[in-house]
A protein has these predicted regions:
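Nucleotide/phosphate-binding loop and acidic/charged catalytic motifs
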Residues: 112
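Acidic Gly/Asp/Thr-rich repetitive segments characteristic of extracellular carbohydrate-active
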Residues: 130-163, 167
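N-terminal extracellular ligand-recognition/capping segment immediately after the signal peptide
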Residues: 8-9, 157-193
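A motif-centric signal for short, conserved binding hotspots located
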Residues: 108
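Surface-exposed loop/turn motifs in large extracellular/passenger domains
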Residues: 1-6, 13-35, 42-59, 63-78, ...
Length: 212
């Protein structure tokens, strides 16, 4: 939605979990603080913060402490100090696979991805073609199975694109709807004599590549 949450001098939202695990899901709107040293979102303790859209702005857009779990798949995070900060003694889980950022978030992107800048100077997440073997929904994966699982765990059908040739036996789980795109010159082969693809869901194969 278009909700606006703002603090002029302090943290706009703190997810301190005094009554069980607190979860913040943001798909739009704005969370901001006018403080140049404040946090727009302060993720604390065992809370969960999921940002898929909207704008988060502060001294630090999202500050993560303790063992909080933060996932960013979209939106714009802008901080005068940092887009995402982490406490020095904190042990959180932070995963960034999409969005735009005022500072580099490379340390938070999963293997198979890296960061670049767009035409406006924002940091964005891109597939690391040197490490990823497959891509799904703009995110790179270091195994084909991980990309298939990502589609299977989503709410919709999706396409997994094989990047280089790969020797890997994979499985499409029941309930999944996956299109496997194999470009020309690329081959998916089995390992240890197993079936290359075991399909228990819905599978379509496109492209001019091969499955052996």
């Amino acid at each position: 939605g278009d909700a606006v949450i703002r603090s002029e001098t302090n943290t706009a939202i703190s997810t301190q979990s005094g009554y069980g695990v607190v979860e913040l899901n943001m798909t739009g709107g704005t969370i901001s603080t006018g403080s140049s040293t404040g946090y727009a979102v302060y993720a604390r303790e065992k809370s969960r913060v999921n940002i898929g859209g909207g704008n988060v702005t502060g001294g630090t857009a999202v500050m993560v402490y303790d063992s909080a779990n933060v996932t960013v798949t979209g939106g714009t995070l802008e901080g005068k100090k940092a887009a995402i900060g982490k406490g020095s003694s904190a042990t959180p889980v932070i995963s960034v696979t999409g969005g735009k950022f005022s500072s580099d978030v490379k340390e938070f992107v999963p293997e198979g991805n890296t960061t670049d800048t767009d035409s406006e100077g924002n940091f964005i997440v891109v597939v690391d073609k040197a490490k990823a073997v497959a891509e799904a929904n703009g995110v790179g994966y270091t195994t084909v199975q991980a990309a298939i699982d990502a589609v299977a765990n989503s709410d919709a059908a999706g396409t997994v694109k094989l990047l280089p040739s790969k020797a890997e036996s994979v499985a499409v789980p029941a309930g999944a709807n996956v299109t496997l795109d194999i470009p020309a010159g690329v081959t998916l082969t089995n390992t240890n004599g197993a079936h290359t693809i075991t399909n228990s869901g819905q599978l379509a194969i496109t492209g001019e590549g091969h499955v052996d």
